[in-house]
């Protein structure tokens, strides 16, 4: 492999890892908030969270990336607002789409881990007279420890999903690989 191509591939790998890290950070924060809203069953927010989960788990990631990148530009009020400085950037749009996607899947994962907490721990919290917030403070770390092995799969899926960012002009690992393949006509 030529040194020039190696440096391009390393640059693409750095972009893919940056997208993965930022998406996981934003997605994890969102998913923890969404999980808490599902657990506490806050009336309106609960159904809004359910709708987001259904939307982002029921559509392909490529469609989500296209909608986040090409969709907002169709509205004048978005193009004229401060949001356009962010939504016109391909990197931000790819990160946002990946973050929302991983937030939806991670929320289901964290909710499942929370539901797997043994009933005895719930009863112990009730016996001690804890309210919902205090119970969450005690049981949420336990649930998160149970969710870590499954969350590692989500990390891999997000990294794989970054290859779709090359469809909206981001030169990540896949983008550089396709360019090199097109220039040299070899793998």
Provide a role label for each language-model segment.
Residues 1-187:
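Transmembrane alpha-helices and adjacent helix-loop boundaries
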